[in-house]
Regions:
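Basic/aromatic recognition patch in beta-strand/loop cores that engages polyanionic ligands
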Residues: 47-77
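Enriched for short, Lys/Arg-rich terminal
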Residues: 67, 72-98
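Basic, Lys/Arg-enriched alpha-helical interface segments
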Residues: 2-59
Length: 98
């Protein structure tokens, strides 16, 4: 399966990198590398994440360190919708693509 990243995820990743990079740019790079690696696992094992009915009936999440990768399984693609810190008010975030 192919991985498709939403525009919102790109913004989430930029925000995440900038937040960590204030203290250590190399650590920010490594953190994002781990997020990309974990997201790549979805191509091989799309069902690995747990269902998130409080977000949407077809949305799942996969834990990566302190963040959650929210995604939806389509016929031939995995749509990554958001990457959010686990302490956020998750049900009240926007998960839909524009």
């Amino acid at each position: 399966m192919k991985l498709r990243i939403s525009e919102q995820v790109k913004e989430d990743l930029i925000d995440l990198w900038e937040y960590i990079a204030v203290h250590d740019e190399l650590a920010a790079d490594r953190y994002l590398d781990s997020v990309f690696e974990r997201a790549g696992e979805l191509c091989i094992h799309p069902e690995i994440g747990r269902p998130r009915p409080e977000v949407h009936t077809k949305v799942r999440s996969l834990l990566c360190r302190n963040h959650l990768i929210f995604y939806r399984i389509r016929t031939e693609t995995i749509e990554v919708l958001r990457i959010l810190h686990g302490s956020m008010d998750l049900p009240n975030q926007d998960y839909e693509e524009e």
